[in-house]
């Protein structure tokens, strides 16, 4: 048995040619997935402070708990951004450290807006779900709020051009909730996803305000464009969903099309063309084609 173990260790310790081709050059430290997950937890503790810290009515004590989380957040995010920069570029460690400090502070400066947006998402989810008994239930347990917390954090980092980390964050939410939102997607305020499992929102999707999706909705690409050398081009290829649109379960909206404001897209619809405002796109009514009493068979 020991010989088998030693043999496997020896083989696995050697880098394969394919493995070498996937590794970054040099020996730069790589982002730490558990630390990135902790970043999200700290942001959640700050934004939903009364729910995830000891609830304190006095502002001074509340500020203390937020401050403790904020200090840890800055240090951790600073370190992980630096690792991400080193992982994806030819920066020196000193250059990466300087840039990471600036980016971490920039992110923290944007936290009030992240908080504002997330509270609109909580309100939209609560108001749109008669099964929700209170706001706390939504914040603590709803998959859409878990996914949107991850997405709102990741989107800010994506706009700041932080490499790797935004995608790690949204894929952590994907694993937790079954909701797949690319950090590059643009999503307005008062956004809700009921149930959530199986929802996919692609990188270049644009979603307006007061939009509601149900489980299984895909906002995806219909086809891909290629350059002269056969490489896929990263161009807008996902839908634009305007304000006050509801998309019901398992609808697939594909390509760079626009769903006009105040529209309803029914369940199990396959849509690849523009829809004007105030539209209702529904399936044809089911037709009963059975034979009465078995006659005619």
Sequence positions of predicted segments:
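Terminal amphipathic alpha-helical/low-complexity segments used for targeting or macromolecular assembly
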Residues: 1-168, 295-297
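Structural signal for interior beta-strand "rungs" in well-ordered beta-sheet cores
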Residues: 173-289
């Amino acid at each position: 048995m020991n010989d088998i173990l030693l043999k496997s260790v020896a083989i696995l310790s050697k880098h394969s040619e394919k493995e070498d081709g996937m590794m970054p050059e040099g020996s730069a430290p790589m982002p730490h997935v558990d630390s990135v997950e902790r970043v999200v937890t700290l942001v959640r503790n700050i934004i939903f402070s009364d729910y995830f810290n000891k609830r304190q009515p006095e502002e001074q004590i509340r500020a203390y708990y937020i401050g403790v989380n904020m200090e840890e957040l800055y240090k951790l995010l600073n370190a992980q951004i630096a690792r991400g920069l080193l992982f994806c570029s030819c920066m020196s460690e000193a250059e990466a450290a300087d840039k990471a400090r600036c980016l971490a502070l920039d992110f923290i400066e944007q936290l009030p807006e992240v908080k504002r947006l997330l509270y609109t998402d909580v309100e939209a989810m609560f108001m749109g779900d008669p099964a929700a008994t209170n706001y706390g239930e939504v914040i603590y347990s709803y998959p859409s709020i878990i996914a949107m917390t991850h997405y709102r954090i990741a989107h800010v980092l994506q706009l700041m051009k932080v490499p790797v980390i935004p995608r790690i964050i949204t894929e952590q939410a994907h694993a937790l909730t079954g909701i797949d939102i690319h950090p590059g997607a643009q999503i307005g305020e008062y956004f809700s996803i009921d149930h959530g499992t199986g929802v996919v929102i692609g990188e270049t999707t644009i979603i307006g305000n007061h939009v509601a999706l149900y489980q299984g909705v895909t906002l995806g690409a219909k086809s891909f464009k290629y350059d002269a050398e056969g490489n896929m081009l990263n161009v807008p290829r996902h839908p634009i969903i305007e304000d006050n649109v509801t998309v019901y379960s398992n609808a697939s909206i594909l390509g760079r099309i626009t769903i006009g404001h105040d529209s309803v897209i029914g369940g199990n619809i396959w849509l690849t063309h523009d829809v004007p405002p105030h539209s209702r796109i529904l399936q044809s009514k089911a037709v009963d084609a059975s034979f009465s009493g078995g006659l005619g068979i």
